[in-house]
């Protein structure tokens, strides 16, 4: 007896053997199948081909194929092709009859292979179907069908007929009532030698390279009128008093293309000519932006034609521009012309075509000229912006100081140049005056003095009686010190300027005590003549007797007396009124301030009493 484990082992071995046998069988079948396909592909050119189909009739056309020699069973498939259906393959028991193309009699009872010439092989409509086991016939590929249709004799005739039909139907190659193709214009050839642009208004002009040439682009604001003036260089050829002027808006491209629109025209204009007809001024408004048209620039094309000039409309008919002063309305423009010496033209282009000839009418014998390139913006502020989109960097405090210092240095240079010129005119050598920069200690010392640091004169300087210092003092004041201090050498100009500025502010923030004015010092500094004048002025004053009596009684008045009826203050006030040149603090202001202070203290005391 076999154990259970041995039985399981045997069953596993049998299953493995069966699996290997099945894989071997499938591999052999696939190898045989591939070998048969390779032989079939090698024998495809030797297989019988079909004869070309008869003239187009609703008949069944049998198609027969010869079986391969290596196949186990020979099969004959016949496909019957009609205009609407396709039949299944027939059996071997039926005998098909084929009609050879060479005119021989057909044989019955067997399938006759048809050997075609290379020309006939290329002219077969239906391609051969390769043998594939367990598969149906597939439709021919479109590439083979296209090539076969193009080489079939019947199809060649059909193609010739189609070509003949297209040649007879094409309206553009034959002459007749059809309109001619619209011409294309370029900016280099459109300008007339008899016209010239003499003025074009704009809010600003910028230089731009267009078609490898430098051009001045005129910037205008949307829906804002500007004037375009043109001039005739030959009045015998062009006279604006007897001409019709039209204008249109075009892109700055090659070839020129008109700006298309749906309902509202992009340009409106009013024109007028001078008395002799030499110049013509056009007041133009543009209602579109350059940003709305991908940033394109615009031209204004002005076309001038005689009054009786024939023009071709969009329908292909000829139209004559009227010579009278009446208003005429057409599909492209509305113009008013006058035969007098002064003519006015009002035009609003309403054409919806993008061809250059639509708005201009047809240019038969007319002359045209282009304006300068135009860029249309919505606001004047947009001109100041950088077109490259570079934002302005925010300046720091140090940057602002350096800018101010640079401007001050420029002013210093210009002023020094003016001073040197003045010295040369007066014959004074420049070597005696050295206008150099001040050092920091000098700036600090000048801040405490009464004179500004920029003035070459000092009040405290010991000069002559007139207060004018000597020349040596000026030179000493302005000469640069020989021993330069090393303070601040490693710092930049902005930091040194900031430190000096802070020091000046500290000086002005300090609280100074009240300085009393001493009359004795003032009187001692006067000459005899000045003292006599002062005595005469004092004698002319009139004083009240009460004040004199009080002055005799009150002998304890000091210089800083705060009495309201002090005689010294009254005399000082009268003296100050007669001598406005001398500037010193007014005692009247002092007294008023003191009275105000006393009143305020009294009020506060009263308030405190009431609250208690």
Curated annotation (Swiss-Prot):
Residues 46-113, 129-185, 313-360, 457-488, 593-612 are annotated as: Disordered. GO terms for molecular function: DNA-binding transcription factor activity; sequence-specific DNA binding; transcription cis-regulatory region binding. InterPro entries: CudA-like. Residues 103-113, 129-138, 175-185 have a biased composition (Polar residues). One of its GO terms (cellular component) is nucleus. One of its GO terms (biological process) is sorocarp spore cell differentiation. Residues 58-102, 143-169, 323-359 have a biased composition (Low complexity). This is Uncharacterized protein DDB_G0287317. It comes from Dictyostelium discoideum. The lineage of its organism: Eukaryota, Amoebozoa, Evosea, Eumycetozoa, Dictyostelia.
């Amino acid at each position: 007896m076999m154990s259970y484990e041995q039985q399981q082992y045997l069953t596993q071995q049998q299953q493995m053997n069966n699996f290997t046998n099945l894989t071997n069988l499938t591999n052999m079948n696939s190898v045989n199948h591939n070998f048969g396909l390779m032989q079939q592909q090698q024998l495809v050119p030797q297989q019988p081909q079909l004869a070309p189909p008869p003239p187009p009739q609703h008949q069944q056309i049998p198609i027969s194929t010869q079986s391969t020699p290596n196949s186990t069973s020979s099969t004959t498939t016949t496909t019957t092709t009609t205009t609407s259906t396709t039949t299944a393959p027939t059996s071997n028991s039926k005998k098909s009859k084929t009609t050879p193309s060479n005119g021989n009699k057909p044989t019955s009872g067997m399938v006759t292979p048809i050997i075609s010439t290379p020309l006939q092989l290329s002219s077969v409509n239906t391609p051969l179907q390769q043998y594939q086991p367990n598969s149906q016939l597939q439709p021919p590929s479109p590439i083979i069908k296209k090539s076969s249709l193009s080489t079939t004799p019947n199809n060649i005739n059909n193609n010739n007929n189609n070509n003949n039909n297209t040649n007879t139907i094409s309206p553009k190659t034959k002459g007749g009532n059809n309109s001619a193709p619209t011409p294309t214009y370029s900016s280099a050839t459109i300008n007339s030698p008899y016209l010239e642009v003499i003025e074009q208004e704009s809010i600003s002009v910028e230089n731009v390279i267009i078609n490898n040439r430098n051009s001045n682009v005129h910037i205008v604001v949307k829906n804002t009128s500007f004037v375009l003036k043109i001039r005739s260089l030959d009045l015998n050829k062009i006279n604006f008093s007897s001409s019709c002027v039209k204008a249109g808006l075009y892109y700055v491209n090659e070839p020129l293309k008109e700006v298309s629109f749906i309902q509202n025209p992009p340009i409106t204009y009013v024109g007028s000519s001078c008395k002799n007809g030499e110049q013509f001024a056009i007041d133009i408004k543009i209602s579109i932006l350059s940003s709305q048209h991908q940033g394109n620039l615009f031209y204004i094309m002005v076309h001038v034609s005689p009054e009786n000039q024939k023009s071709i409309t969009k329908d292909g008919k000829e139209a004559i521009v009227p010579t009278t002063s009446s208003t005429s309305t057409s599909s492209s423009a509305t113009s008013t012309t006058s035969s007098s010496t002064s003519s006015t033209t009002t035009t609003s282009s309403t054409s919806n075509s993008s061809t250059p000839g639509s708005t201009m009418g047809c240019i038969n014998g007319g002359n045209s000229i282009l304006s300068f390139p135009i860029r249309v913006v919505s606001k004047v502020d947009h001109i100041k912006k950088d077109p490259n989109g570079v934002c302005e960097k925010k300046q720091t405090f140090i940057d602002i100081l350096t800018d101010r210092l640079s401007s001050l240095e420029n002013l210093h240079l210009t002023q020094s140049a003016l001073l040197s010129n003045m010295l040369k005119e007066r014959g004074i050598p420049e070597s005696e005056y050295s206008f150099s920069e001040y050092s920091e200690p000098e700036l600090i010392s000048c801040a405490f003095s009464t004179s500004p640091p920029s003035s070459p004169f000092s009040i405290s300087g010991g000069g002559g009686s007139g207060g004018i210092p000597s020349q040596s003092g000026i030179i000493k004041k302005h000469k640069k010190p020989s021993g330069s201090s090393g303070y601040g050498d490693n710092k930049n100009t902005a930091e040194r300027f900031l430190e000096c500025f802070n020091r000046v502010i500290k000086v002005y923030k300090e609280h100074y005590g009240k300085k009393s004015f001493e009359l004795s010092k003032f009187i001692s500094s006067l000459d005899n003549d000045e003292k006599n004048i002062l005595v005469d002025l004092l004698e002319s004053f009139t004083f009240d007797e009460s004040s004199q009596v009080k002055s005799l009684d009150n002998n304890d008045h000091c210089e800083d007396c705060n009495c309201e009826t002090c005689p010294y203050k009254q005399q000082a006030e009268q003296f100050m009124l007669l001598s406005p040149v001398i500037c010193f603090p007014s005692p009247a202001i002092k007294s008023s301030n003191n009275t105000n202070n006393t009143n305020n203290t009294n009020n506060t005391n009263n308030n405190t009493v009431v609250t208690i």
